[in-house]
Structures are given as C-alpha cells and as structure tokens.
C-alpha cells in the first residue's frame, strides 16, 4: 500500500472518530439540576430511570429552595430547577431567567410532625405544649417552603410565639430531619416523604397536620435554558413512570 493510500485511510478514520464523538456528545448531554432537599430520594430514583432510558447524565444538587434561587439569579449554571414551592419558579420566569411557559407542578408535598423516639407511640398537636420538649426542629422559613408551612401550622395552633425559644432551624428540610434523627431535637416538622420511604423504614411516630392549617405545598419545576436534553428531562418528569415514583415516595400528584 502506497503512502497516499495510507494517508487517505488515516484521514477517513479521523473523520469517523470526529463524527462519532460529536454524535455521542449530542446523544448524552449532561444536565445540571437544582433540587429541593425534600425531593432527594424520589429524585434519585427518577434520575436513575431517566439516565438508563435517555443516555444523558444528570448531575443533582440538593439544597433549600431559597438558596438555590439565590444561586440561580447569580448565574449558577443549572439547567433545570425543581423547587419546593411555586413562588420562586414563577419569579424566575417573570424575571426572564427561566424559559417562558415551562413551569410545571410535579408534586404536592405534605408536612408531618415527627419524633424518632420509638417509645412515643402516638403523637399529635398536644405534644407541642409538652414541657419535656426542649427542642423542636424546623426548616428555616426564610429559605424553605416546608419551614413556612411549619410556621403556619404553629401559628394556627396558637403556639408559634410560645415555642420560639425551643425552635432549632435547619437550612433546609434535610437538616431539620437530621436534628430529630440524631436526637438533637425531640420533635421536628419535616416532609412526609422523609418518613414515607419505600427503601427503608424510619423509626418513631408522626402526626400529619390537617392541610387546612397550612397553604398547599405545590412543588414546581422550571427550565433555565432551551437545551433539548433539559426539555427531555422535564418531559420525563411529567410522564407516567416518574409520576408513579413520586407517588411511591409519599407525594400527592397535582
């Protein structure tokens, strides 16, 4: 084989490799998703299914809705935002930071009052006034919609002011859960999805406040760019498989 033929083969192979690598990058994009802490377990399950089906890689960042919102308006490179409320996605859309008409309500959350102590068989709102309760964990209402819901419940039960010295505020609902789980707080207002976990039983007891005591926790998602992979992910989130997973983790569907 002469030198010219060898050169032509080398050029052809180079072109094939370039086309292959280019098509691979199109088919398997990376999607960066900011997710409210309460939705972490459900989101991991949804992501595993989506990655298998789509070939895309999803990078998850969990935290409080308020903190994620601040990061996004300051230029954090997220593609999709799954909030624990409808307010921040709405504001992002109004500000032009999020894609117009891309907001969806993906889940409706529920609040519970939880103790991890196994000896506590039954709890209800009366336990909030118990003198043995020294610490009550909540997510910070300034950052977390679940913290706002907890404040609303206590306000409507007329105990918000009397419990101020006992409150331990977590940056997000996951931290509020850890305060109770570790024993640093006897009680805590957390997300129902954190105790209704299909993967592992959570010890202790909980009380579900009537939803008349707090505003509905409608959790919305919004696109932060028009990447096809981002749109594919949001479309998957609305699909039957994702919705079944969401229900399995204790959420109501919109």
For the regions a language model picked out, list residue spans one by one:
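Bacterial N-terminal signal peptides
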Residues: 10-22
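Low-complexity, intrinsically disordered regions enriched in charged/polar residues
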Residues: 7-9, 25, 122
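Exported/periplasmic ABC-transporter solute-binding proteins
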Residues: 27-53, 59-62, 66, 70-76, ...
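Polar low-complexity intrinsically disordered regions enriched in Ser/Thr and small residues
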Residues: 5, 23-25, 207
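Bacterial N-terminal signal peptides that target proteins for export
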Residues: 1-13
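Active-site acidic carboxylates
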Residues: 101
């Amino acid at each position: 084989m002469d030198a010219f033929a060898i050169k032509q083969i080398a050029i052809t192979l180079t072109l094939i490799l370039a086309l292959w690598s280019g098509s691979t990058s199109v088919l398997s994009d990376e999607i960066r998703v900011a997710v409210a802490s309460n939705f972490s377990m459900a989101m991991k399950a949804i992501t595993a299914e989506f990655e298998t089906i789509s070939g895309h890689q999803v990078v998850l960042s969990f935290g409080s809705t308020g903190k994620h919102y601040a990061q996004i308006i300051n230029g954090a490179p997220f593609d999709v935002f799954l909030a624990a409320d409808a307010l921040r996605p709405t504001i992002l859309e109004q500000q032009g930071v999020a894609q117009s008409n891309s907001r969806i309500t993906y889940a409706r959350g529920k609040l519970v009052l939880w103790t991890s102590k196994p000896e506590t068989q039954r709890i209800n709102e009366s336990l909030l006034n118990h003198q043995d309760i020294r610490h009550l964990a909540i997510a910070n209402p300034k950052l977390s919609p679940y913290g706002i819901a907890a404040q609303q419940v206590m306000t409507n039960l007329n105990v918000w002011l009397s419990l101020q010295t006992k409150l331990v505020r977590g940056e997000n609902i996951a931290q509020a859960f850890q305060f109770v789980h570790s024993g640093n707080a006897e009680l805590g207002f957390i997300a129902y999805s954190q105790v209704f976990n299909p993967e592992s039983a959570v010890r202790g007891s909980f009380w579900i406040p009537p939803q008349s005591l707090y505003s509905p926790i409608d959790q919305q998602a919004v696109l932060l760019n028009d990447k096809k992979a981002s749109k594919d992910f949001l479309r998957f989130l609305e699909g039957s498989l994702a919705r079944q997973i969401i229900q399995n983790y204790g959420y109501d569907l919109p």
